[in-house]
Amino acid sequence: MTESIVTPKENPLAVAPVGGLIRRFALPAIVSMLVNTIYNITDQIFIGHTVGILGNAATNTAFPVVILSTGLAQLVGIGTAANFNLSMGAKARDAARSYVGTGLIMSAAFGILLGCLIYMFQMPVLLLCGATENVLPYAQRYLGITACGLPFLLFFTANSMLIRADGAPSYAMRCMVSGAVLNILLDALFMLGFGWGMEGAALATVMAQIVSFLVCIRYFFRFQAFPIVRTMLRMRGREMLRIAKLGLSNFLNQIIMMTVGITLNNILTHYGAASVYGADIPLAVAGIVTKLNSVLIAFTVGLAQGCQPIFSFNMGAGNYGRIKETYRKGLVFALLLSMAIFLVFQLFPRQITAIFGGGSELYFDFAEKYLRIYLMMVCISGVQPLTVNYFTAIGSVRTGLMLSLSRQGLFLLPLLILLPHIFGLDGALYAGPIAEVLAFILAMSTMYRHWQQLTRMERGK
């Protein structure tokens, strides 16, 4: 069993080699993030092969709901995990207990509320997300079922972060993997075997999410830092605010990402309708590229989340040199991961698109063009999430929030609105790489200034 967090001297976060710690915590976090994307990618692949382009477009219009769920999970999960680690690093065990109990109840309450709201208002939600007349019936059949799984999705996504913070990254990975494997098996059974189409994909997703939820719940009966007792499980106003404070930057980033997705869908259908591709092909391709980009996000954000306990604990313990070493090595890993994925996207765009089903030559032409242009600068995209998570983990909420919102809100969203008016459909594609470069410059310049401050703190210790 992994050693529980007790004191800085005893805890491996304070004394173990940094490179090994990053690998130990980041690998399960990356796998967990990847598995979370598999819920959506698996459906997209099976739907593409059994339903076709309209089915792929339908999952794209439902995807902003998943982004919203992820945002709420990160608001609670990252905020709870960061406060838990900061409290344990400062030897404040009672405060850590309060954060854990509050975080568990918050994640359950938010999930139930979101699921009910989406189920009741699914038609206006889908129209807002860009569903065309052809796509809407498929999207309704899909979202009407997957809305019922949102409470389970939000709970296990949020609390897998707390499980990692408790020193059990492998178990957090198990929560995600168990559901993902079942999702793949049920997709094959329900769609290929029974021919249930969109409903089969949605049902497979919900059943898999329930399994991941049950595996996650099981862990809290043997929480390592301290026992979870019933009196801990209540919402406390002060703890809720502090959890929200440290999770806010990640949450708002997801909200902006959702807004960008909705804006992009509507721009693609509007300008696509006036092009040779029509409205439905760009909408379907955007769904595929969004899912592929989520693979990159899984690697980079998973790496950043894996570094978070090291950042938080050592800031609480005052180990500034160790914090700098963690960021340096995390940056190298982030750039290597981003470059590897960039090469795959640039070299094999058509082959990757074919994984998600067949289509006309126009469909594949647009998919190849979209992949190569929109994801042109993903080779540097790992820097921003690492830097955002760093500032969030050490409690610098304003800086983390500013950086978190920069790529999507400050740069990408305005570019998506402006460039298509000048360059048409191509303008929406080039907005992606331009925003990536601007966000990279902002993150590195901000970290450079903070690095000098860390050096002074290290020398004055």
Tell where the protein language model's regions lie, with residue ranges.
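Short alpha-helical transmembrane segments in multi-pass integral membrane proteins
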Residues: 1-26, 84-151, 193-248, 311-377, ...
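Residue-level signal for short hydrophobic patches within transmembrane helices
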Residues: 19-38, 42, 65-72, 148, ...
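Transmembrane helical elements of multi-pass membrane transporters/channels
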Residues: 24-43, 145, 179, 208-212, ...
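Transmembrane alpha-helix boundary and packing residues in multipass membrane permease domains
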Residues: 29, 33, 45, 49, ...
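Helix-terminus/linker motif at the lipid-water interface of multi-pass membrane proteins
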Residues: 34, 38-56, 126-133, 189-196, ...
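Small-residue-rich hydrophobic transmembrane alpha-helices
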Residues: 56-116, 153-172, 265, 283-349, ...
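Hydrophobic transmembrane alpha-helices of multi-pass small-molecule transporters
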Residues: 68-71, 183-187, 213-217, 295, ...
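Short runs within selected transmembrane alpha-helices of multi-pass transporters and secretion channels
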Residues: 77, 146-164, 172-180, 201-214, ...
